[in-house]
């Protein structure tokens, strides 16, 4: 009793065999030369010019209307869909109707890839179509696609379950074509940024992902082991220190688009693996970098959306430069009435208590201030806003402020209540840098597992001399969320990190036979999706009886049907 596959899966495998029996290879090795796309035909076809009279298109069959000796189907390629008109007499000129009557009508299915040779025309109803002279099977789909129906502008049976969409992104891209546009725009964001940097003579570089010391940010790293060297290594949490070593080495400006990894929480705006762009430019400071960042984001918005005026989470947000600038101290004072200037760790801890900000004993001054800011200020920063001049304890890699040594020359850009980028006038004093690293070590000893490691090679590089330099890092995933108005980071990642799929444990056959289910019916019931005896108790006996009989008949199982009373007994069993 073979019922491991659904009826559709069985039929498609039978079609696969039938194609081969007819001498048609369902997965041919030869290339198929495509001469036009659906969009090119839609954008450029002209009845008067009679262009596209000899085209070869290829794609996936997405719908069919079979009408005797002539039919229509929709072909979807990477640019969109186009209707194809196919007629038996055109593709079966020798009088043998097999190619149309058997192959097209019976052995091809929605989801199959085919190539079509023909010419473009408008049907009597004005629908742009390709008249098929010849088709070639390119790939047989043996698993049916979800069928999304549209009628009168309404969508039915849409493929919208986020859990399934993220796990099976390939399927999401097939049946939800608007999803592809998000990723096309993501690529445009990165291309525009590269163009912006390259025009200014900055060099794109690559730095190690496996690092002996995870530096450049305060975060918990992933740890791995190199068997040959017998050493632990870390997946990088930032590219910063290696890029600054290149500035030491004489590059005037370098940037990198790279994957970073942080072994921390997952939510709608955080994924443990994420894409970040970092850029470092010699002889610049954080004031210059603010203007540079404004110009870059203004250009990205125009390239991706054609305007700097966007809507994010229903709120109008403008990326037109210049952006607002506020100091962190003033922002906290404005929102809480508390002045963090010159406060000790004990005073800040007491302030957190008074302000009902949750902290723990491992927090130093920097994290205490960050906790206050995060709870009271971030969500209020809707329009693009530079928060500047952070307390020194929050920024171990940043240069002291030129007019206040308790502050640093740092800014973060906030948009829609979220941090988008982080930038410094980079610390280039090797003695000061070592002292900052040592302070991070003290925080680590207190239990702060996000404190920075001491990187003595980086200190050594600074000892050779690094020019005045400004650096900026920006999260590409979050930028894409803003530019495409997506509320979840999973919607801008092709394959976001997911928790393991929950595996439902089937009840043993004995549990079913104990309530009267015949042994031969147990695998059938479980194949129908009722994996536990408990699941039967939630069913309406009459409907379940009809479903059982229908499944038995459809799959030609030949089992003796139970009576309605027997089925009622299974559902009512305690």
Regions found by a protein language model. Give the residues of each.
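Class II aminoacyl-tRNA synthetase catalytic cores and aaRS-like
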Residues: 1-504
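Compact, charge-rich alpha-helical regulatory domains located at protein termini
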Residues: 501-574
């Amino acid at each position: 009793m073979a019922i491991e596959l659904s009826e559709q899966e069985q039929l498609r495998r039978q079609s696969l065999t039938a194609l081969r029996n007819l001498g048609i290879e369902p997965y041919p090795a030869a290339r198929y030369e495509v001469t036009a796309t659906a969009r090119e035909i839609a954008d450029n076809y002209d009845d008067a010019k009679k262009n596209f009279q000899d085209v070869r298109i290829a794609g996936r069959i997405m719908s069919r209307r079979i009408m005797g000796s002539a039919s229509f189907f929709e072909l979807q390629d990477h640019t969109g869909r186009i209707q194809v008109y196919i007629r038996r007499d055109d593709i079966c000129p020798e009088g043998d109707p097999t190619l149309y009557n058997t192959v097209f009508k019976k052995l091809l299915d929605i989801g199959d890839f085919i190539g079509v040779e023909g010419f473009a025309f408008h049907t009597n109803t004005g629908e742009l179509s390709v008249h098929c002279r010849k088709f070639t099977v390119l790939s047989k789909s043996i698993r049916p696609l979800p069928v999304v129906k549209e009628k009168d502008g309404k969508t039915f049976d849409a493929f919208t379950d986020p859990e399934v969409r993220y796990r099976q992104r390939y399927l999401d891209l097939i049946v939800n074509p608007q999803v592809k546009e998000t990723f096309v725009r993501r690529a445009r964001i990165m291309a525009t940024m590269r163009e912006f940097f390259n025009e200014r003579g900055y060099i794109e570089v690559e730095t190690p992902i496996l690092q002996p010391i995870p530096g450049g940010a305060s975060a918990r790293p992933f740890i791995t082991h190199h068997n040959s060297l017998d050493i632990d290594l870390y997946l990088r949490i930032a590219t910063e220190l290696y890029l600054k070593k290149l500035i030491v080495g004489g590059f005037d400006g370098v940037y990198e688009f790279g994957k970073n990894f942080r072994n921390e929480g997952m939510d709608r705006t955080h994924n443990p693996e994420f894409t970040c762009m970092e850029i470092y430019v010699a002889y610049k400071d954080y004031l210059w970098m603010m203007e540079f960042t404004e110009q870059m984001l203004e250009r990205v918005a125009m390239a991706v959306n054609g305007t700097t005026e966007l809507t994010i989470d229903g709120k109008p947000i403008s990326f037109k430069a210049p952006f607002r600038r506020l100091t962190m101290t003033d922002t906290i004072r404005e929102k809480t009435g508390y002045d963090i200037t010159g406060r000790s760790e004990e005073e800040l801890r007491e302030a957190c208590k008074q302000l009902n900000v949750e902290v723990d004993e491992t927090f130093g001054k920097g994290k205490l201030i960050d906790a206050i800011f995060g709870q009271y200020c971030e969500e209020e920063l809707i329009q693009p806003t530079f928060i500047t001049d952070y307390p020194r304890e929050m920024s171990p890699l940043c240069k002291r402020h030129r007019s206040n040594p308790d502050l640093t020359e740092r800014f973060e850009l906030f948009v829609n209540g979220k941090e988008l980028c982080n930038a410094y006038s980079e610390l280039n004093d090797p003695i000061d840098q070592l002292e900052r690293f040592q302070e991070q070590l003290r925080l680590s000893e207190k239990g702060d597992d996000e404190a920075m490691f001491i990187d003595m090679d980086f200190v050594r590089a600074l000892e050779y001399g690094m020019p005045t330099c400004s650096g900026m890092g920006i999260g590409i995933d979050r930028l894409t969320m803003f530019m495409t108005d997506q509320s979840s980071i999973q919607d801008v990642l092709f394959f976001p990190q997911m928790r393991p799929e929950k595996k439902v444990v089937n009840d043993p056959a004995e549990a079913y036979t104990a309530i009267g289910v015949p042994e031969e019916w147990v695998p059938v019931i479980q194949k129908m999706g009722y994996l536990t005896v408990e699941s039967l108790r939630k069913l309406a006996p009459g409907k379940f009886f009809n479903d059982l009989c229908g499944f038995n008949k459809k799959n030609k199982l030949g089992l003796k049907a139970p009576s309605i009373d027997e089925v009622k007994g299974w559902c009512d069993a305690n």
